[in-house]
């Protein structure tokens, strides 16, 4: 059993695994993380909406689980999903793997522009911190998820987290520019 967190704009006691985007890193599903601090930093403020962190327990026993590391297999799976190709793991209950840092720091266009080789794009995706995402892809997985609580974040929390992300992004973009220069 692991504790997982979902950042969003509403309390979600029973997630819909078919609601998410098909072209997200790990395909369509309900995205969570086991890193509480990252969940708090990941969420963005949305005008007219509460900013909510939902907390759950996930029982992995009895589920078909695929785990990725930051490697070529992960890279190919993420890029396949980003290109909206058929999801080869659609029948897997839970997919666990790193978040592609371009998602966090808005550099996707450079990586998917076609101007980089796959090796160069992967090198760029591996810059920066490695945060895990845990994606529930089937109804069976959702049935193994137990809602524990939700918390509405206030403006002070959101501002503090925004500053942390800004600092991380600045360091990431500095390293990104350095690697881009090396690739030129």
Question: Where are these predicted regions, by residue range?
Answer:
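Conserved NAD+-utilizing ADP-ribose enzyme module
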Residues: 24-25, 45-52, 58-184
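Extended catalytic/binding region for NAD+/ADP-ribose chemistry, centered on the ART fold
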Residues: 21-46
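Short linear motifs at secondary-structure transitions and domain/linker junctions
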Residues: 4-10, 28-34, 108-112
């Amino acid at each position: 059993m692991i504790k997982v967190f979902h950042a969003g704009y509403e309390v979600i006691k029973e997630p819909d695994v078919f609601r998410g985007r098909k072209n997200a890193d790990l395909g369509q599903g309900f995205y969570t993380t086991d890193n509480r601090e990252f969940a708090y930093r990941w969420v963005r403020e949305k005008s007219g909406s509460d900013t909510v962190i939902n907390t759950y327990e996930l029982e992995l026993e009895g589920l078909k689980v695929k785990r990725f590391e930051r490697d070529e297999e992960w890279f190919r799976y993420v890029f396949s999903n980003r290109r909206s190709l058929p999801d080869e793991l659609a029948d897997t209950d839970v997919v666990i793997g790193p978040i592609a840092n371009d998602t966090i720091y808005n550099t996707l266009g450079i990586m998917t522009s076609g101007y980089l080789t796959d090796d160069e794009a992967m090198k760029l995706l591996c810059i920066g911190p490695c945060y895990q995402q845990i994606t529930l892809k089937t109804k069976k997985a959702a049935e193994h998820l137990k809602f524990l609580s939700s918390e509405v974040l206030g403006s002070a929390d959101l501002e503090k987290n925004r500053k942390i992300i800004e600092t991380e992004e600045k360091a990431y973009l500095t390293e990104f520019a350095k690697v881009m220069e090396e690739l030129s």
